[in-house]
Structure formats: structure tokens, C-alpha cells
Amino acid sequence: MDSLVVLVLCLSCLLLLSLWRQSSGRGKLPPGPTPLPVIGNILQIGIKDISKSLTNLSKVYGPVFTLYFGLKPIVVLHGYEAVKEALIDLGEEFSGRGIFPLAERANRGFGIVFSNGKKWKEIRRFSLMTLRNFGMGKRSIEDRVQEEARCLVEELRKTKASPCDPTFILGCAPCNVICSIIFHKRFDYKDQQFLNLMEKLNENIKILSSPWIQICNNFSPIIDYFPGTHNKLLKNVAFMKSYILEKVKEHQESMDMNNPQDFIDCFLMKMEKEKHNQPSEFTIESLENTAVDLFGAGTETTSTTLRYALLLLLKHPEVTAKVQEEIERVIGRNRSPCMQDRSHMPYTDAVVHEVQRYIDLLPTSLPHAVTCDIKFRNYLIPKGTTILISLTSVLHDNKEFPNPEMFDPHHFLDEGGNFKKSKYFMPFSAGKRICVGEALAGMELFLFLTSILQNFNLKSLVDPKNLDTTPVVNGFASVPPFYQLCFIPV
């Protein structure tokens, strides 16, 4: 009986604490739906499609509103004006990374994606500088992407125009580009180590996009005490870190300090320079996690976009025909596509942009946080508050993009057929937390897609009208449904 009384008292205290925290903070924060004790607004949000729920709530509470995930307040920004004001106009104040408990377990605050403060700034600055020195957006990395595009075309030829699921092959190409940047090595598509790495990356994007992960991140005790797919994700990350550590040891034994070959060499050189400046942010643990982040951000996002792009091109054969006509006119058949071609191919450029806009790969991006107490639109948001960005509300804005739910390359073309930029184009987020590999991803999408369409016609196994382009999961990332196609050599 005594234990029951204690339990009831504990629960009562928890409920009172929950109510007090919510009521004391709500006077400062933007308005929002009334949260339930302990669980907050979790029942009012469709976990399978958070973005749709945010759109519905914005119609009631406006472009800036507050939700509670458990006891934790989260300020939501919906629509271009609110997102721009926060991420661009007040970029420094909104540059923090929001709480992501599962990532905390995986990387302990290291790396480039989930770190904060001085650690994040130094690692991000170093990573950007190193990638630029190796030619991100310049010639040397373009050579690597072109080489991988040629290998991709050869792998597709091996399908002999038979029906195939493109998931694996389209994942190999961007993964190999990242391998060449980090390890100075590309792998054969049949290499077992490479296959294991690909498998872990593919599993992780599916797990991260599941409703279960949303629950884990908002009720963090689940991570330590409950079984579930989150444990598989943590094991996959541990596998990748151990693999990278092996490569780091190989580099330490063979590195030429006067001739760095890749990202690992550059990081080890930085560690050597910083060894007298303790404590340094440049450690082996930081290198492991930064490399894992580059793999995660640079492989599955690009391969998922490529997979979605081919599905949309199957669905819209008239678009595919126009792209192939432009390829034939500008590039021809006797040389590989290059980035200089893009400025002469406005329709193809528009298609690449429209694919990214339409699929809305990361509907709410990753959570941000404010780095200080900030007054925002007459609300006071306390330091450390998590900020949720609705990228969907920007990419699918119906004023900027008429009929935003329709796939239409003319969203990025003017009346004369010239490519038209849009400030609403934010597939990689915006501001200080914009994806480090934005330029690389854009290069890969253009070169891989043009190389495929230069060499193959795409054949659907069903009537294009019957192809479903609805994402199968739409949590962290929008993942396309399973499909097969035939690559018919031109």
C-alpha cells in the first residue's frame, strides 16, 4: 500500500510540474494548442506526416506557434517570411542545433551535424575549407563525379535492359564520391566492405524516417530501456565508426604531411598542428563522427533524390523527352556531361530543381535551437528552445509555385524558357546551418541524371499514369515507394 501511495504522489508531482512548466512558459512563447500533461501535443500531431499537421496548425495559430513534445516546448516556423527572418536575418541567433537524443547517444555531441557552439563552428569551418581545397564546386571533385558517372552508366548497362530496382546502384554512385573525398578511394560496386557500408546507410535513412524515431526523440528514456529499431540505428553508426577508425589508422601509418590526399589526411594534419593548443576540438573521436556525418549527409540524401527523380521522369515521359532533346543538342553522344553545360541547359536545370522542390526530401529539416534569449515577432523565446522549420511550407508555397503539388519544371523557367532562380528554393535548409555539401549534391544530381539520360531511355513496367509517387515514409525524410524500371541503351 505504501508503495502505491508513493507512486501516486510521484505521478501527481510530475503532472503538477508539467502543468507549471507549460503555464509559466506560455506567456512568453508564441500561441499554440493546449498541451496535455506529460505528453504535450503529441496526440494532435500525425507522426506519419508531421508536415501536414504543421500546415493545419498554422492555419489556426499563424506562421509562428508553439507545440509541446512531452514536456519540451518547440517553436514552429511556417512559411517563407518566418523562416527567412529566423535563419537568414537572425542567422546567428537561430544557428543552434536542437535536442536530438538519439544523435546524442550516437555521437556524444561530436561531428558537424549535431554539434553546437565553438566545437560546431570550428569543425564546420575546417570541413568547408577542406572540401573547397579539394575542389568542391571546382574541377578536381567534378572529375571524381564524372568518373563515377561513367562507372554508374557501365553498371546500368550490365542490367541488359531487364527490369531492376535502382535503389542499390543509385546509392553506390554518391557513396563512392564521398569515399573518394574521405578515403581517396572508390570501391567496386561488388566489394563486400562497400556493400556493408551501403547497407547500413540505407537502413539508417529508413529507420530515421519512421514514426518510432519521432517518439524516441521526444521521450528519450525509451532509447535506453525499450527495444526497437533505434538500437539497430545505433549499432549501424557504431559499425561505421569502427570502419572509419580502421581507415584512420591506415592513414596514420602512411600519411605524407607534405601531400595530403583526402579529408582524413587533412584532419590528422590539423590534429598535429593543434596538439599544443589544448583542449582542441580536433580529436580522433571528432574525426570519426565528422566522417560519419559526411557519409550520412552525402550519400543517402543524394541517392534518395536520384531514385525519386527517375520515378518522376517515368511518370512524366514528356519531361524526359525534353531533357534528352536538350542533352542531344548541347552535349551530344561523344563526350561526358560537365558542369559548364548546365548554363546552356535551362530546361534540365529546371527539372533538377523541380525534383528537389517537389519531393521535399527533408520536410522539417533537422531541429534548430536559439543560442540566446531572443525577441522574435513580439515573442520571447528562451535560450536553448528547439525550433522546428517547415521546409515544406517554403518549397510548396502556392504563391511562389502555382499548383505546388504538381510536378512542373516551369516553376523554374521564365516566359522565355530561361532558368529562373527562386529564393524559396531551400531543399538544403538556409542560413548558417545550410548543408555543407550543397554544391557537391547539386553537381552530382546534374551529372548523374544527364549521364543516365544521355545513355538510356527509361521504360516503366506499368502505365506511367498508374505510377504512385507518394512517399512511403514522410517523417525525417521523404522516401519514394518501391518501383522497377528498364534502362534501355540509346
Curated annotation (Swiss-Prot):
PROSITE patterns, alphabetized: CYTOCHROME_P450
Cofactor(s) needed: heme
Annotated phenotype, changing residue 204 to H: In allele CYP2C9*57
Keyword annotations from UniProtKB, A to Z: Endoplasmic reticulum, Heme, Iron, Lipid metabolism, Membrane, Metal-binding, Microsome, Monooxygenase, Oxidoreductase, Steroid metabolism, Sterol metabolism
Known catalytic reactions: an organic molecule + reduced [NADPH--hemoprotein reductase] + O2 = an alcohol + oxidized [NADPH--hemoprotein reductase] + H2O + H(+); (5Z,8Z,11Z,14Z)-eicosatetraenoate + reduced [NADPH--hemoprotein reductase] + O2 = (8R,9S)-epoxy-(5Z,11Z,14Z)-eicosatrienoate + oxidized [NADPH--hemoprotein reductase] + H2O + H(+); (5Z,8Z,11Z,14Z)-eicosatetraenoate + reduced [NADPH--hemoprotein reductase] + O2 = (8S,9R)-epoxy-(5Z,11Z,14Z)-eicosatrienoate + oxidized [NADPH--hemoprotein reductase] + H2O + H(+); (5Z,8Z,11Z,14Z)-eicosatetraenoate + reduced [NADPH--hemoprotein reductase] + O2 = (11R,12S)-epoxy-(5Z,8Z,14Z)-eicosatrienoate + oxidized [NADPH--hemoprotein reductase] + H2O + H(+)
The protein's annotated pathway: Lipid metabolism; arachidonate metabolism; Steroid metabolism; cholesterol metabolism; Terpene metabolism; (4R)-limonene degradation
Effect of residue 125 to H: In allele CYP2C9*35
GO cellular component, one term: endoplasmic reticulum membrane
Keyword presence, NAD: no
CDD domains: CYP2C-like
Effect of residue 144 to C: In allele CYP2C9*2
InterPro entries noted in UniProt: Cyt_P450 (IPR001128), Cyt_P450_CS (IPR017972), Cyt_P450_E_grp-I (IPR002401), Cyt_P450_sf (IPR036396), Cytochrome_P450_fam2 (IPR050182)
Effect of residue 150 to H: In allele CYP2C9*8
Gene3D superfamilies, per database record: Cytochrome P450
Protein family per UniProt: Belongs to the cytochrome P450 family.
Name under which the protein is recorded: Cytochrome P450 2C9
Source organism per UniProt: Homo sapiens (Human)
Biological classification of the source: Eukaryota, Metazoa, Chordata, Craniata, Vertebrata
Gene designation: CYP2C9
